[in-house]
Structure formats: C-alpha cells, structure tokens
Regions:
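A detector of single, family-specific signature residues
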Residues: 1-402
C-alpha cells in the first residue's frame, strides 16, 4: 500500500509517497499543474509496486485540476476537509509549517485512514457549471446589496426616504421602480419646485414611459412628503453625477443577478431531479436551482444523515458520564451557501404557510412549543433535507438506466 500525500497550492503542488512504518518511497518533490508534470506524476504512481491511494485537501479551487486529472487516469483520489488534516497527529511541541512537511503529514493521514478514505467523484459538467453559476449569483447578490445600500446612503442626502415609496419586486431585467424613480427625481427639488398638477402630469408620463402603474393618490402623497423634506447636498451637476453613477452600478448588478437567475433555472431544468425538486413547497424558480447546485448528485450520499451532515444542520451531541446536554448547537461544518438557501426556503414556508406540507407543520409545531427562531429554522432545514433526499433518490431509482 502506497500513500500519496499532495499539498496543493495555486499552480503547483508538493508530493510525497510513503508506505507503512514510515518508509519513504519518494521524498517530497514539487510538480507544476501542467499536462506534462501531471502525466509524469501518473506514470510515477503507476510504476510503484502495490495499491496506491492519493490524498489531498480540498482547498478552494486549487485541488480540482489535480483531482480531476488523476481520477481520469483511473487512480484512487480522496479529497479531505483541511480541518481533518490540521487536527491529525498533533503530538509535537514543535510547530513545523512547510509544504514538504504538510505533504508528508497528508501521506501519513492516508496510511492511518486507509480503510475510511472515500473516492473523489468527478462532477459532471452540467452540475459543475450550475454550482459555479450559483457561487457567482451569491457574489453578485452581495454586490447588489452593497450597491443598493450605497445608493440609499447618497439619496438620504438629496431625497431622504425615496427608497421606501415603492415596494414592487424587481423585473426580469433587474429594474426596480424606486431606483428608476430616484434616477429621474434624484433630488427633492426635482419634485417640489413644480406645482402639484405639473408633478402629477410629469409623474403620469414617467409611469407611462417606464410602463409602471400610475396612481394619482400616490403622486399626491409623494408631493406632500417632498414639501417637508430637508436635503443636505445641493441640486447641481456634481450631485447629479454622483447619484447617476450609483444608479448605473446598482442597475448593472441587478441585471447580472436576474440574468444569472434565469440561466440557472434553464440549466437546472436539464437535471433529472428537476421536476421533483420544483414540486416541493417553498421552492421556486430561484431557490430550486440553488438547492440543486449546492446539494449536487444525491446518489453520492449513503443515507439521510449524510446529507444533513453535508449541510451542517445535523444536531450536535454533548454527553459525558451521567451528563447529557439537552440543546446542542448544530455542527455548521458543511456548506454555508446551502444553509443560507435552506433558511430562505424555510422563510418562504413560514410566509406562505402551506397547511398540507410536513415541513411547515413541523416548523409550526416547534414554534408553538416556544422554540427559539434558529432552533425551529434549523430543525425545519434538517427535515426538509431528509425529505428531499428520500423523494429525489426514489425518483432517480425509478428512472430507466441510460
């Protein structure tokens, strides 16, 4: 048995090959993440007598090139959580941190955990694209939130409270009524310098041009509030430029978010489990693809507990002797993006309260018992994942083999 420990970094890796009882087959050496170096590594591993297993840490995206290419070469590859490697065999007072030492430590981990190593599965291209899109979607959502807060902060100095005038959702192109309104009426003087009738006519024409619903009572309300507001920044070309730039940045982020949302739904619709997932309560055209992106192929989970462990919503245990803690926090060692999506699904269930849904019934029961918010939300996410696992796995098993 040969343990190949690979300490992965960006563009290069350190490799060490060991056998039981500390026998060094190959001292740590460096390889580049190029086709020639990876091919040479495959030939070296195949030339070593006996079964070989490769272990590396799944850090960021760095490891994926090696893991993918070595798996395609029919080698046993296992990608391990970096925390497990870090906590392994810390029985020395001396702290040594180098790529060579890390590769040897990973090889020793492979020997110690030989029987428990799980083989790395190459994700198919469609799921990989969907997951990448979801990560981009989350990134641009954060950008959109930052741009929105930035615009509101500027408008508070020219037209305080204008962002609260309309609550209509974003359109398919990402545009929002309050943003478009603030782009046109960027300063309170843009409204109150006109007469009431003139503003109503102007606002009505604006609604018609932008294809928004017009309400005369709303126009009168806006005009009345404008009379009482006190701006800080003057109504001049510099202030207008600042606001226009902030609006353009927000609209750009919003457009990207909505285009990604649409593309993710189109991509997810090609997955076999799409109809089952989309039929679940609390899941729609936005959250459904996000769930499928983060969970991936359900068949890789051996049981229901494995999928809740993966999400980090599994209940913790703290027992010692006669002591048994009643309420233990969840591990939160899994995918934070998946937990966020699950909480959004739970939030939809609470707002829509479908009485025939078992997850909502469970959440409602926990709320009635007086459980704290995070307790019943996490418990609901756990139950939702178990149902998700059961329904999807049953459906996939019923499909004819391709």
């Amino acid at each position: 048995m040969n343990a190949v420990g690979i300490d992965v970094s960006k563009g290069k890796s350190m490799v060490a090959i060991m056998r039981p009882f500390g026998e060094i087959v190959s001292a740590p050496f460096e390889i580049k993440h190029t086709a020639s170096d990876i091919h040479s590594l495959v030939e070296l591993i195949n030339s070593v007598e006996g079964e070989s297993r490769i272990v590396m840490e799944h850090t960021g995206r760095y490891y994926e090139v090696l893991a993918h290419q070595l798996s395609k070469a029919n080698l046993f590859v296992s990608a391990i959580n970096p925390k497990l490697i870090k906590d392994f065999d810390n029985d020395s007072l001396r702290k040594v941190k180098s790529d060579k030492a890390d590769s040897v430590k990973i090889a020793r981990y492979a020997l110690d955990k030989w029987q428990n190593l799980k083989q790395y599965n190459v994700m198919d291209e469609l799921r990989n694209q969907l997951k990448t899109m979801n990560r981009q979607f989350c990134f641009y959502m954060k950008c959109k939130t930052a741009m929105k807060n930035n615009l509101i902060g500027i408008l508070d100095q020219t037209y305080p409270g204008v962002n609260t005038y309309f609550d209509s959702p974003a359109r398919s192109d990402g545009s929002q009524k309050w943003v478009d309104f603030a782009s046109t009426y960027w300063h309170v003087d843009c409204v109150r310098k006109m007469s009431l009738n003139a503003f109503i006519d102007h606002y009505q024409n604006w609604c018609k041009r932008k294809k928004y619903n017009f309400s005369q009572s709303k126009a009168e309300e806006i005009y009345g509030k404008a009379k009482e507001l006190v701006p800080v920044l003057p109504k001049d070309a510099i202030t207008k430029l600042i606001i226009k730039q902030a609006v353009d940045q927000l609209n750009s982020a919003s457009t990207t978010v909505e285009s990604l949302r649409t593309l993710m739904n189109e991509t997810a619709s090609k997955l076999p489990e799409y109809p089952i997932v989309m039929a679940m309560k609390g899941v729609g055209a936005s959250l459904g693809p996000q769930l499928m992106a983060e969970i991936g192929d359900v068949s890789r989970f051996t049981h229901k507990g494995a999928i809740t462990d993966f999400a980090g919503v599994d209940p913790g245990v703290n027992e010692s002797g006669s002591y048994e803690q009643k309420s233990v926090p969840t591990s939160k060692r899994g995918s934070s993006d998946l937990r966020k999506t699950l909480f959004q699904v739970m939030d939809v269930l609470i707002k829509t309260h479908p009485q025939d849904d078992p997850v909502y019934q469970f959440i409602d029961k926990k709320r009635a018992q007086g459980k704290p918010y995070y307790v019943y939300m996490t418990a609901g996410a756990n139950k939702f994942l178990r149902i998700y696992y059961g329904r999807v796995k049953e459906y996939l098993s019923s499909l004819p083999e391709s």
